[in-house]
Amino acid sequence: VMAANASTLPFADNSFDVVINEAMLTMYADKAKAKLIAEYYRVLKPGGRLLTHDIMFTAQKLGAGDQGQLVDVVKSNVSPMTRQGWRDLFLNCGFEQVLQQNGNMSLMSPRGLIRDEGLTGAVKIVFNGLRTSENRRRFLKMFRFFRSQHHQLNYIACCSVKGK
């Protein structure tokens, strides 16, 4: 496992069989997403796989007020896409095959936190989220938002395959 700046990876072309991107592409505008994916494509060997996990809209997009709330609670100019939007993005960046799975997002749910982080990790996250008044305000705002928008937001996992 290696960590590097995703926009300028310090590796030669065709270096890796697998590149993993965890919940980061959503944080970028569509053009920036394409640039990052092109960089992942560059370092993948022919037949290599890009594995991503991100946020997906279940409809075309959130309402303007809801999108503004999402940006506010995450503190980033987040830009999720639909299932087809994610597929098109990877195909337009040169990948020959895109396998996808999506489902209910458990971000900020007690069950999801325990499953993803383990009991100790979940307790630590909740403790840190509630420790100060500012943390508590932001944590509860995120919790309420993701709970209220659960029908409009899913997780999506993609396995994009570079041609041989």
Each predicted region: which residue ranges?
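A short SAM/SAH-binding and catalytic strip from SAM-dependent methyltransferases
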Residues: 17-32
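Short strand-turn motif at the edge of the Rossmann-like AdoMet-binding core
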Residues: 30, 53-56
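Short, glycine-/aromatic-enriched active-site segment of Class I SAM-dependent methyltransferases
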Residues: 55-77
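Short alpha-helix
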Residues: 78-94, 100
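Conserved Class I S-adenosyl-L-methionine
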Residues: 99-164
